[in-house]
Amino acid sequence: MTDLKITLIRSAAHSLPEQRKTVKALGLGRVNSTVVLPDNAATRGALLKIAHLISVEEINK
């Protein structure tokens, strides 16, 4: 099972409201904040919406 380490690298301040809500729903707040989430379809779908704002690394358990 793998997890995803997601880091916000660009601010969501001037993004669309839906993208700002997605950033907040993933648990990201400020630039350079990082969360570790499970690798599943729901997470991947959310990441596709804000791919231009984040960096993603896979973490093997």
From Swiss-Prot:
GO terms for molecular function: structural constituent of ribosome. InterPro entries: Ribo_uL30_ferredoxin-like_sf (IPR036919), Ribosomal_uL30_bac-type (IPR005996), Ribosomal_uL30_ferredoxin-like (IPR016082). Disulfide bonds: none annotated. GO terms for biological process: translation. Keywords: Ribonucleoprotein, Ribosomal protein. The keyword Ribonucleoprotein applies. Coiled coil: none annotated. GO terms for cellular component: large ribosomal subunit. Part of the 50S ribosomal subunit. HAMAP family: Ribosomal_uL30_B (MF_01371_B). Belongs to the universal ribosomal protein uL30 family. This is Large ribosomal subunit protein uL30. It comes from Lactobacillus helveticus (strain DPC 4571).
